[in-house]
Structures are given as C-alpha cells and as structure tokens.
C-alpha cells in the first residue's frame, strides 16, 4: 500500500463541499439583495453540517481494530484549512509538485469521459471527469444520473453522494429548483490533485481540488475539494464501495496554503 507522508492538520473544522457551495451562493445572494430569510435558512443548515462533520471526524480518528487496509486509508485524517482559504487568494511564487494525468480515450455512461488506464493517475483523472460532468450539469437530475452510472455497488447513491448534497445546497442557496436555471452557469476546473494512497492495483484514494466559477447574474469563485475511493471494476475506474473518505482541504489552487497542504498541479499528457 502506498501512502503519502503524514501531514499534521491544523485542528480547524473542515467545511464540506456542500457547505462551501452554499457559502459561495450566499455571497452572490447577498450581493443581489435577496430576502434575508434565505440567508438565515442556509446558515442554519450550515451549522448542522459543521456538527455532522465534527462527529464524522471523531469517528475517523478512532478506526475499528478490524478495519481493512482500504478503510484505514480512506479514513486517515487529512490536513485541514480555514474556510477563507477556499476563496481566491495570492498565487505563490513557489512551484508546486506536478501530477501528470492521462487523457480520456472515449465517452462513457452519462456522458462522462473515460478510457483512463489502470493506474493511480488514471483513477484521479476519472474522478475529475465524474465530478466535472456532474456539477456542470447544474441540476439534481444531472448529478444523480452521473453517480448512478459511476458508483460501484455499496458506494455512494443518488441520495447519499456528497455531489448530490453539494448541488442541492447550491441550488437552494440560489433560490432555484432542482431543475436549475438557464441563468445558472457552473464551470468546474480540476486544477490540483493528490494521490492519498493505494491498496493493490485496483483501489486508490485520490483527491481533486477544483476551481468552481458560478454565475447567477454575477460571478463568484471558490475552491472545492473532493476525495473518493476509486475501484477498478471491469474495464474502468468507478467510485468504490464504502463511506466517502476523510475530506481534503478546499484551498484556492496555487496558493501557499494549497502547496503546504500537499496539493500538486495537474498536467494532462
């Protein structure tokens, strides 16, 4: 099993992708003078989300004695970051490490690019393609369709996947229905990544740090990170069975904080 060197976290509570997306939309909503009641409702939801995240972190910190290697890798704590670190910040003069990712060779179910090799880098490229396709759909149907086709049995479902939760938070904070809106534009760029570790050739825990650009009359940007168990099933990588891994820090790509957290620049070859 290959593991990244352990990095000590800061101890700050980690914000989930759903919470960060809701916060992004709150900034746009406030700027557009939408009713204060919406803001209060979202803040209430975020408070509960933080409580749930802390409970999950405590559980991850005390794994069961009979935990498998895959579970141990997935639940191992990641570095943490302040929520403000997810917002655009000064780009570092320091060069980050580089991860070279393969390019897709075909199109798979739910219009997700596929054909990546059976390597850790291939699994990371596949996760990036899954997330980009799901979130750029801008609708609940879009994210549900993607995870239905790209999760192994025992993995995330259209009800439990963090991507579904994130889309629901974004649409709710924007005052939109589950169908989205022609006025909503979401551009998702996988900018940095890391390979947390592998167990054999068919299992990897990988993370992608995305730059989200969301436009609803005005444009806002934020970094959102996603870590998933990736399993080789048949002839492709899919999101594997089990609970989603410990979250990676959502940090604006290219900053000192991102490099310190272990993120590496992604380069397609």
Where are the language model's segments positioned?
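N-terminal, charged low-complexity regulatory/assembly segments
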Residues: 22-25, 38
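Terminal targeting segments of Actinobacterial cell-envelope proteins
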Residues: 1-22
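Conserved aromatic-histidine-acidic binding/catalytic patches
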Residues: 17, 26-27, 115, 135
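Short beta-strand edge/turn micro-motifs at domain boundaries
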Residues: 85-103, 223-254
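Core segments of small alpha/beta cavity-forming domains
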Residues: 94-171
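Glycine-rich, aromatic-bearing surface loops/beta-hairpins
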Residues: 29-38, 228, 235, 243-269
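Structured, amphipathic secondary-structure segments that form assembly/contact surfaces
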Residues: 1-6, 140-234, 244, 254-257, ...
């Amino acid at each position: 099993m290959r593991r990244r060197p352990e990095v000590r976290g800061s101890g700050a509570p980690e914000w989930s992708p759903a919470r960060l997306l809701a916060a992004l939309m709150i900034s746009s909503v406030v700027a557009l003078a939408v009713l204060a009641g919406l803001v209060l409702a979202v803040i209430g939801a975020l408070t509960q989300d933080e409580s749930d995240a802390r409970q999950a972190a405590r559980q991850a910190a005390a794994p069961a004695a009979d935990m498998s290697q895959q579970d141990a890798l997935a639940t191992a704590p990641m570095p943490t970051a302040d929520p403000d670190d997810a917002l655009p910040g000064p780009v570092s003069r320091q060069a980050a490490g580089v991860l070279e990712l393969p390019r897709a060779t075909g199109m798979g179910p739910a219009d997700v690019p596929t054909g990546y090799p059976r390597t850790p880098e291939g699994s990371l490229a596949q996760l990036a393609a899954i997330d980009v396709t799901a979130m750029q759909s801008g609708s609940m149907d879009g994210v549900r369709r993607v995870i239905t086709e790209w999760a192994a049995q025992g993995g995330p479902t259209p009800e439990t996947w963090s991507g579904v939760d994130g889309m629901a938070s974004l649409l709710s904070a924007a005052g939109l229905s589950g169908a989205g809106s022609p006025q909503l534009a979401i551009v998702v760029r996988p900018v940095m990544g890391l390979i947390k570790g592998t167990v054999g050739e068919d299992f990897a825990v990988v993370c992608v740090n995305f730059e989200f650009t969301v436009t609803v009359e005005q444009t806002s940007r934020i970094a959102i990170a996603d870590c998933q168990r990736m399993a080789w099933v048949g002839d492709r990588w899919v999101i594997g069975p089990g609970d989603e891994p410990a979250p990676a820090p959502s940090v604006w790509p290219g900053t000192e904080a991102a490099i310190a957290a272990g993120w590496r620049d992604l380069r397609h070859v």
